[in-house]
């Protein structure tokens, strides 16, 4: 059995098996500030501004926001998104405005068309897929791993992931929730 869980490179890797997936790859930027005294006890998300922030053990603020808005495999970001993310952060927490930015980077996100992941077997015997986690991939790793391990070990989906089937896109059974998937109607 082979399990494919490679995030933003899923489409590229699975194309080598002649699979065309309902995924788009986008850059999601993240930022880290200088070390500060404890300010944020957990993770704070701001849906209206599409902003998230937490504080590392070393005191740096780790934050980010929306995808760059175009398909890309580049692992770098642009200044326009930096400005957008910082505006969202300042709208939520004006006190972070004096923190100095130390670094920024971009990671590739595999975005499903309905904003929900795919945890399923493929039409190729012994090949299983865990993809399309959009913005929540790293945060969802424990539950994702649990459900994917169940599928690989037992051959059928865990009850928590039984709706995350690959064929839902072909059959028109997209998951109707506030997922933040790609927006193919805008491309």
Pin down the residues of each PLM region.
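Flavin (primarily FAD) binding-site architecture
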Residues: 4-19
């Amino acid at each position: 059995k082979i399990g494919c869980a490679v995030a933003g490179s899923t489409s590229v890797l699975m194309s080598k098996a002649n699979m065309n997936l309902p995924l788009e790859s986008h850059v999601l930027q993240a930022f880290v500030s200088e070390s500060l005294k404890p300010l944020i006890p957990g993770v704070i998300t701001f849906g209206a501004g599409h902003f998230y922030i937490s504080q590392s053990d070393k005191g740096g603020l780790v934050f980010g926001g929306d995808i760059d808005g175009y398909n890309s495999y580049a692992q770098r970001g642009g200044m326009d998104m930096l400005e957008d993310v910082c505006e969202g952060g300042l709208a939520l927490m004006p006190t972070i405005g004096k923190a100095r930015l130390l670094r920024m980077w971009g990671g590739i996100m595999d975005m499903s068309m309905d904003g929900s992941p795919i945890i399923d077997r493929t039409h190729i015997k012994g090949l299983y897929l865990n993809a399309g986690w959009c913005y929540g991939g790293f945060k969802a790793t424990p539950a994702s791993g649990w459900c994917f391990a169940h599928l690989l070990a037992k051959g059928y989906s865990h009850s928590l992931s039984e709706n995350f089937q690959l064929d839902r896109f072909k059959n028109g059974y997209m998951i109707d929730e506030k997922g933040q998937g790609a927006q193919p109607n805008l491309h």
